[in-house]
């Protein structure tokens, strides 16, 4: 069986790892260190570590792989192939050169579009109607290696980061399973990326999460679904942060300053943007409160909201 080192961290990576364990010989798993999570800051292992522990696989968790003791240990292994999926660190050249079959990455975009750490988020924020999975050889430069295989998938109007993450996780494992036999046999082809067509999807920053209502409704809507259910787009109402998990676009003839609540229904808070498409907030969370449907919030506040300004 092909001896594989797997490198990944979040839930996206676990589907790929489970497939590799079932089909090949995973001799080591490399992931990020445990991190404190929640208000009580409980040290929590990354999802990939949980899967590896279930199968009693050796786990390496370097804070930074380059120059680490873990890297030296990995370089001593007899390995055929390195597979990464959302690992979160660049690999040192010494490790890239270790396996005789090379190092490959499962990336959640149709490269060369959306190189970087947040390709699913950015594709939705940009209003793309499709994205996909790329299996590629790894090189020193970020997400720039030759493409081995790709498969596209449609982004539906009601998709958000959560739904596309789940679809792409399965697609990534399936495409890798289809692609690996030719890689192992040495019969696969690969195509260089056109660097002139490259776009980038950097990790989401806090400032990317704040909604600017002075934009077309479609852009605000895409931002909300492109950040849901994590890290979540937010605005401010009455000096209190308001996270918005779900919304929809509605046509309006009412002319109001962007960010103004122009109407409430039984199920939504409707907010003006800078065009004739308003945003209807359906699922929300005020700071310090539990997440709730707008319908539940409106049962006690419906008559007090119209005219308020979100900023």
Swiss-Prot record:
Record-listed E.C. numbers: 2.1.2.9
Catalysed reaction equations from the record: L-methionyl-tRNA(fMet) + (6R)-10-formyltetrahydrofolate = N-formyl-L-methionyl-tRNA(fMet) + (6S)-5,6,7,8-tetrahydrofolate + H(+)
InterPro entries, per the entry: Fmt, Formyl_trans_C, Formyl_trans_C_sf, Formyl_transf_N, Formyl_transf_N_sf, Formyl_transferase-like_C_sf, GART_AS, Met-tRNA-FMT_C
GO molecular function: methionyl-tRNA formyltransferase activity
A GO term from the CC aspect: cytosol
Residues that hold (6S)-5,6,7,8-tetrahydrofolate according to the record: 109-112
UniProt cross-references to Pfam families, sorted A to Z: Formyl_trans_C, Formyl_trans_N
Keywords attached to this entry: Protein biosynthesis, Transferase
CDD domains listed in its UniProt record: FMT_core_Met-tRNA-FMT_N, Met_tRNA_FMT_C
Catalytic EC class: transferase
One of the GO BP terms on file: conversion of methionyl-tRNA to N-formyl-methionyl-tRNA
Function: Attaches a formyl group to the free amino group of methionyl-tRNA(fMet). The formyl group appears to play a dual role in the initiator identity of N-formylmethionyl-tRNA by promoting its recognition by IF2 and preventing the misappropriation of this tRNA by the elongation apparatus.
Family label: Belongs to the Fmt family.
PANTHER family referenced in this protein's UniProt entry, alphabetically: METHIONYL-TRNA FORMYLTRANSFERASE (PTHR11138), METHIONYL-TRNA FORMYLTRANSFERASE, MITOCHONDRIAL (PTHR11138:SF5)
HAMAP family according to UniProt: Formyl_trans
Protein name: Methionyl-tRNA formyltransferase
Lineage start: Bacteria, Bacillati, Bacillota, Bacilli, Bacillales
